[in-house]
Amino acid sequence: MLDGPLFSEGPDSPRELQDEESGSCLWVQKSKLLVIEVKTISCHYSRRAASRQSMDIQASYWARGPQNRTCRLRPGSPEPPPRRPWASRVLQEATNWRAGPPAEVRAREQEKRKAASQEREAKETERKRRKAGGARRSPLGQPRPELRNALRAAQPTGFPVFSRPERFGQVGRAPRPSALPQGDPGVAWAGPWGGRRPGPPSYEAHLLLRGAAGTAPRRRWDRPPPYVAPPSYEGPHRTLGTKRGPELSRAPTSSAPVPATTRTEGGRTKKRLDPRIYRDVLGAWGLRQGRGLLGGAPGCAAARARPESCKGAVEKSSGLAAAGLNSGGDGHSQAKTTGPVTEVALSGSTISSPPRPVPRSRQHLRGSRKGKEGSEEMWLPTCWLSSPKKPPVRHSQTLPRPWAPGGTGWKESLGQREGTEHETLEVWKVTRRAHTLPRSSRGPAGREGIFVIDATCVVIKSQYVPTPRTQQRQLAPSGESCIVSDSLRQPKPCLEEEGKGAAANPSVCQKRLLSSRVLNPPSEGREFEAEGRQQGDSSLEERSSSGLGFPVGEVNPRDAPTHPGSPEHSTLGPAAPGCAGSVKGPEAAGVPRRAGGGWARTPGPYAGALREAVSRIRRHTAPDSDSDEAEDLSAHSGSSDGSDTDAPGASWRNERTLPAVGNTRPREGGKTAELGDSIGEILDVISQTEEGLVREDTRKTPQGKRE
């Protein structure tokens, strides 16, 4: 409906002005191009309105608002992009810039729908005004339209040309965009054109613009909102900020201190300048890669330094640096942190880098080769002093230095390290700026440590890794601390078999292992035997079997030591020594291993917890650490060493253990193979951890047993 009136009117008074622009055709085409029915009006008016910005007065008129915006935006380029957003900056316009006018258009359309009558009235009023004042205003506005018309007339070829003229207009009319944006939504749009050309708007602004564009329209409310692509990366993100302390400090430092070092590699010197640009313009992006990629020099320096730094350690550190961090410098800092190899690298790499403490990575890389000799002498001591701290100096700028925890302490670290490396201080002074200060200081100060947040891979790994002691503490329920090592070792093999001598113990160990591998039922039988001998032990056996996933027989060895006080324990004491040897290697090792693995930690008392854990694991659920479930589980686990810790850890550990546990015995047969495998694994590791674990278990098991 708008189109008809617009056309008639557009041709009427606008024709005079728009004929110059060859506006009528253009409007239609553009409206079609925009695929916005009413866009014809806005397009038509855009030219007209551009010429008659007096007409822009009618912000009330939705079309006019668009016209005004369009006209203003168009001169600025916002308007054309909506029509030809695809041409100049597809990404930018699609993401950021289209937001302005497209949002307006959508809002306008909605407004039309919402207040079609009002809009019509406004249109009529505007049309009348245009007709009456169109000629008058057009003369006033004509000059502007004439500019546009001149461009468009010169480019009457069509909107394609027109769109490009508008680009020109954007360039030539850049001032106009500012003027046009005055009250138009496009102002943020057009104005940002000028301001944003350096870079895309902040993502927040982008979302506001683009989201706002899409929010009002939301025609399909039943569907999720359209995906808002992040602003195109034509320029640095505003959100990144220009605070590239390390990079700035390094690059400027590179320029200042590097002259000698940097001169050696003139290209790099230039690149250092580029890195400065990267820091300032690209910010964190420039920094992280400024060292490795954007800077170009740092990465190359690192690569060269690695091969060139003849020191194997230096190469290693360089490799580490390059591998660990994009920039060799960062890598070196990390390498330094890494350790002795790092230190070697420090002497080699850092020595050269000290001359340019901030650009240390580059200096190290470049200076290590060329400035190395002189700088090494000078900086070798300094490097060594600062190198432990320096590694952070190379801090890979994962985050803007200001965010680094040590940012505030940069002065102190700078004073200390830079005292060591006066040049670093100088560099820092040169590079330190309000925004850069923390980071530049960080360069030298980073030596303390590196604050790196590596979010490249968002992997949340939550694992409860109980100390071997904790796990085994639960395993040895009744073992008093008094019988910790001796009773544990002695009775373990003999637990099941009190009467059996040391000779029987090896077989017992074997039997236990076999039973654990073969089936838990055999272990159950043994467990029952143990129970006959020691009710407490049987419970211990069950616990250990359930906790460790070992058959009770297997667990019994520990259970017996666990109950050193029991008569069986006394009997075991003498026989145990023999068993201790045999059991200790294969079985004691097996049991503690499981404990280390986290299985040993769930004794019979935790059977409920184990079952819960198994079910949860199968359901891929876990009690919330904050929830009462964890507490309940801990209580169930009743581990003296920290139920809260045990509960979660026990849960997942128990899941593994349960298969072999007496509680899980129905499944044990199926799990026997797993148990056998795990047992072999356990035996391997347990021999090492057995003694310490057993002692701990014995001490803490009594509590667990009591619980």
UniProtKB/Swiss-Prot annotation:
Region spans: Interaction with CD2AP and NPHS1: 406-707
A Pfam entry, by short name: Dendrin
Keywords associated with the record: Cell membrane, Cell projection, Coiled coil, Cytoplasm, Endoplasmic reticulum, Membrane, Nucleus, Phosphoprotein, Postsynaptic cell membrane, Synapse
Annotated segments matching region Interaction with ACTN1: 340-434
Chief site of localization: membrane
Record region (Interaction with MAGI2): 186-236
Biased composition regions of type Basic residues, renumbered to the chain: 359-369
Modified residues (Phosphoserine): 387
Localization (cell): Cell projection, Dendritic spine membrane; Cytoplasm; Endoplasmic reticulum membrane; Perikaryon
Sections of the chain in a coiled coil: 103-134
Nuclear localization: annotated span: 113-131
Cellular component GO terms, alphabetical: cell projection; cytoplasm; dendrite; dendritic spine; dendritic spine membrane; endoplasmic reticulum membrane; nucleus; perikaryon
Tissues in which the protein is found: Specifically expressed in forebrain structures, particularly in neocortex, olfactory bulb, hippocampus, caudate-putamen, and limbic system (at protein level). Also detected in spleen, liver, kidney and placenta (at protein level).
GO biological-process terms attached to the record: positive regulation of transcription by RNA polymerase II
Source species, domain of life: Eukaryota
The protein's role, per its UniProt record: Promotes apoptosis of kidney glomerular podocytes. Podocytes are highly specialized cells essential to the ultrafiltration of blood, resulting in the extraction of urine and the retention of protein.
Miscellaneous comment as given in the Swiss-Prot or TrEMBL entry: There are 2 forms of 81 kDa and 89 kDa detected in brain by an antibody raised against a C-terminal peptide arguing for alternative N-terminal sequences.
PANTHER family reported for this sequence: DENDRIN (PTHR16757:SF1)
Quaternary organization: Forms a ternary complex with MAGI2 and SH3KBP1; recruits DDN to the cytoplasm. Interacts with MAGI1. Interacts with ACTN1 and may interact with WWC1. Interacts with the podocyte slit diaphragm proteins CD2AP, NPHS1 and NPHS2; the interaction with CD2AP and NPHS1 is direct.
Listed name of the protein: Dendrin
Source organism (scientific name): Rattus norvegicus (Rat)
